[in-house]
């Protein structure tokens, strides 16, 4: 060999063979690697399917949670519309909703991250899917070759089926002929049964006719006997007629005796008597003979009819005998035909047995051929099933990828939708929070105005009391009546909380009817007079909400002063001097301008204020008097642009404090003057006689200094009661020196 004929000392043939073998080895390794990766890909797909199912379940759970939160939020909105004072609950629910929104946002971010990961995996799977499409093309070519083979097998099976159908057609023809023979045989049997039944019917008819014949024969014998008797009677009558010919001459002489003859013709027993007297009964005998002739004629007619009937019976008897003979001949012919058909049936059954044997032999031959063909077909079907499994697996993968892509799109849409909903709910929560804040501000302003108005009311009531004591002292300066010098007691700052006072104003719709505090005698309000009454305490216990429950309510805010205290005592916590000393001028803030002045004259007492001027809020639907509506409208106009309705004010803000304990008055009052109802308050003249002065009943009741509740101040909450009970000690009951004397008229 030449040195240039082979590279590096190896011949070219070995190099080419090694290259070809290496190429095939690389192809084999690549194919095995692809099969392994496809199996790993299936496992990954299962894992991804499990992960997706878990994510979908989590999504469903989140949707359920979100629906529950949405329902709670809707219920919260309804409750907020129904209860204007439940703002703290809305704040807590808004915080919970914000927390849930934060959780949902976190979960959405996690889901977005998972979606990105799944999109990357989808891209990888698409690249793998393109490779699988190439494999599918190769598989489709193999499927076409297998389909050609299956077509050839189907043609062979069709030929076998054609031969099988021919045998089936021959078998069906034989079965049809046999069925026709069976039908003819059954018809003949039915006709035979019918003929036998007809023969039985005819036999019954013949027996009946024989009975009729016997009866007719008996009647014939009886008729013959009757005829013989009649003939004998006729003979006797003829003999007597011959004897009567001799006495014809005597008939003319005895015409006068006709009346006697009519009486003697009723019975045949008198015939002998007429014969003994021929001249008298000759005519009657002739008449009797005529009657006998007529009866004989009738008997002859009956005899002729009987003869006719007998002849007809003989004719029917002959016809029946002929019909019975015909039926017997038909029965014999039918029996011969039946034997002929039975012989034919036996022949056909023998033919059928032979044909079935031939059919079974042909069937066995065809069955053997079919078994061989089915084996070949099963082998080819196994190959086709493997290919179909590959195709179905690939199609399932395609469908799963498409479904996943659709689920991802839907999931993105739901995420955007819920993000929009979360933004809307956040806006609603912010709006609710701002509305609650504005409502709280309005409530605080209204509380201040209410306290100021109540202070005015206390001053007016104090003036009314003084006017009741001294009806002619009308011009009384305002500065002469300090809180410490008032007969109603000390400053309202030292009163107990609004929860322990008797309510002057009517309660709200949520609170129920008016109730009095059990801690004070006779309710402890302005209208209480005299010592306490134990049944009042029992009446207050009938309420569903007791004063103890209200005192221990943790949702109420603390108050620095009672609801009747002026606004400067609510806004500023000041140190007040002990009772008996005057207030410094520098400590008092400037007073507000009076915003509520009533057109009242002298009132007969605080009880009338409570009974006439304070209508119940439970009757706000038209039962409020016009004077009160005008006064309420005036107060609303003076309160500015506040849009909080009067019914939303808590009932405890409209209650009077128990600090104003008036001195007990006379149990029997004097006559009252006529009532003037033109103003918002009831106008009356001065009472007659005037009550005794207040100094007669002893000194004013003492009070204890206020005590602040330890701890930080609590935020106000818009409930039925705005203020929490303070830690004040209750007042001691009034100690009258003696009861006043009854006025005399």
From Swiss-Prot:
Membrane association type: Single-pass membrane protein
Spans traversing the lipid bilayer: 13-30
Protein family per UniProt: Belongs to the cTAGE family.
Biological process terms in GO annotation: endoplasmic reticulum to Golgi vesicle-mediated transport; protein secretion; vesicle cargo loading
Native source species: Homo sapiens (Human)
Example of a GO cellular component annotation carried by this entry: endoplasmic reticulum membrane
Name of the protein: cTAGE family member 2
Tissue: Testis. Not found in tumor.
Ranges in a coiled coil: 84-254, 290-411
Region (Disordered): 508-589, 611-654
Keyword Transmembrane helix in annotation: yes
Modification type Phosphoserine: residues: 267
Keyword vocabulary terms for this entry: Coiled coil, Membrane, Phosphoprotein, Transmembrane, Transmembrane helix
Compositional bias ranges of the Basic and acidic residues kind: 538-558
Compartments reported by the entry: Membrane
Gene: CTAGE1
Biased composition, class Low complexity, residue ranges: 512-521
